[in-house]
Amino acid sequence: MLDTVALSPEIDALMNDIGRKAKAAARPLSFASTEVKNRALNAMADAILANKAEILAENAKDLKDTEGSEMLASFVDRLTLNDKRVAEMAEGIRAIAALADPVGEVIAAWDRPNGLKIERVRTPLGVIGVIFESRPNVTADAGALCLKAGNAVILRCGSDSRRSSQAIHACLVEGLKAAGLPEHAIQLVPVTDRAAVGAMLRGLDGAVDVIVPRGGKSLVARVQSEARVPVFAHLEGLCHIYVDGSADIEMAMQIVVNAKMRRTGICGAAETLLVDGAAIGTHLTPLLEVLTSAGCEVRASPTVLKVAPGLKPATEEDWSTEYLDAIISVAVVDGISGAIAHIQKYSSNHTEAVIAEDPDVVARFFTEVDSAILLHNASTQFADGGEFGMGAEIGIATGKMHARGPVGVEQLTSFKYRVHGAGQTRP
């Protein structure tokens, strides 16, 4: 938990120095060639694989610190690294290297009647601050994405993932040096003092351009409340699935179980299942059975309890709860209109899915539901930058300014205008 703390002059001095170094590194990064950036990224991936044993050893120490604590299983799962996850981390960095470089891309171009030729061109944001808790893989993902987009990044991990993040960060610095890029392009805050978070939120004397929080609701809420710089964030997942009467029941069963149970502790996990009232007799019971058979606790609305009286009744609080666990709330709704109304009332605007074969139902869902990610006949667990072909993501944003949905390399850029003339003067 990252609570508000008093100002610390020593921490402020340390953090402002980190900010100055990041800002200095951001300039050469902003015009570094694609070849050089990709060389650094591939060297980072090589270093992570070469140092896998050390990374896992440091992660084991972090995990040992959670023993005897009251950490949720989902928290420990996010903290845990293994051979597969380390390999995926390296693969993710290589995937980012393989992406098109957004910097310098001409987004739009047009000619004016007076002969001026105008181009809108992607540019780096500058310095990005990433504050995260139990996900050591964020060190690699955020560092690589920011580098690809020509940005410097300041990473502040939680004390729970400190050792793992330090081991991964050392590999990133090794990659920067191998490509001749400034080592301060990717910095990891060396202290766990919570005052460091406050300093980042104040912008480090103008060094930080954007803050991205990755963590629990309390962290994100604090960042959104206190930050004096723009924030890319979502407060919670709270994803919904609506199963329409037109849905293929076998498909719906597979999708619902995957959306809830594949990984229960991620923000793309489904937390509420809505079933069309017209399909109670055909769809509700099979969906409940497949969920309970998978080990999921179901919290049921009164209408659902009439069909399955042995389930736990849902409270009003359940409809606005992100469980991050093997628990799901289930309600029967009055068709697509009822589903949209429920989602509009309780959604966090993160991700929602509709399972339906009726194109009119799908069209209404896509038009009227105002969440960052909408899926048709697919699991909510696809709400991920890697699955979107972005290589990875630095986070998922649910706001409507600048970035929305998975924040990948393109979303980590701004733009400028280039105007070519031939001696024009304004009358």
Curated annotation (Swiss-Prot):
<dbReference type="InterPro" id="IPR016162">
    <property type="entry name" value="Ald_DH_N"/>
</dbReference>
<dbReference type="InterPro" id="IPR015590">
    <property type="entry name" value="Aldehyde_DH_dom"/>
</dbReference>
<dbReference type="InterPro" id="IPR016163">
    <property type="entry name" value="Ald_DH_C"/>
</dbReference>
<keyword id="KW-0028">Amino-acid biosynthesis</keyword>
<dbReference type="GO" id="GO:0055129">
    <property type="term" value="P:L-proline biosynthetic process"/>
</dbReference>
<comment type="similarity">
    <text>Belongs to the gamma-glutamyl phosphate reductase family.</text>
</comment>
<dbReference type="InterPro" id="IPR016161">
    <property type="entry name" value="Ald_DH/histidinol_DH"/>
</dbReference>
<dbReference type="InterPro" id="IPR012134">
    <property type="entry name" value="Glu-5-SA_DH"/>
</dbReference>
<keyword id="KW-0560">Oxidoreductase</keyword>
<keyword id="KW-0641">Proline biosynthesis</keyword>
<dbReference type="InterPro" id="IPR000965">
    <property type="entry name" value="GPR_dom"/>
</dbReference>
<keyword id="KW-0521">NADP</keyword>
<dbReference type="GO" id="GO:0004350">
    <property type="term" value="F:glutamate-5-semialdehyde dehydrogenase activity"/>
</dbReference>
<dbReference type="Pfam" id="PF00171">
    <property type="entry name" value="Aldedh"/>
</dbReference>
<keyword id="KW-0963">Cytoplasm</keyword>
<dbReference type="InterPro" id="IPR020593">
    <property type="entry name" value="G-glutamylP_reductase_CS"/>
</dbReference>
<comment type="pathway">
    <text>Amino-acid biosynthesis; L-proline biosynthesis; L-glutamate 5-semialdehyde from L-glutamate: step 2/2.</text>
</comment>
<comment type="function">
    <text>Catalyzes the NADPH-dependent reduction of L-glutamate 5-phosphate into L-glutamate 5-semialdehyde and phosphate. The product spontaneously undergoes cyclization to form 1-pyrroline-5-carboxylate.</text>
</comment>
<dbReference type="GO" id="GO:0050661">
    <property type="term" value="F:NADP binding"/>
</dbReference>
<dbReference type="GO" id="GO:0005737">
    <property type="term" value="C:cytoplasm"/>
</dbReference>
<protein>
    <recommendedName>
        <fullName>Gamma-glutamyl phosphate reductase</fullName>
        <ecNumber>1.2.1.41</ecNumber>
    </recommendedName>
</protein>
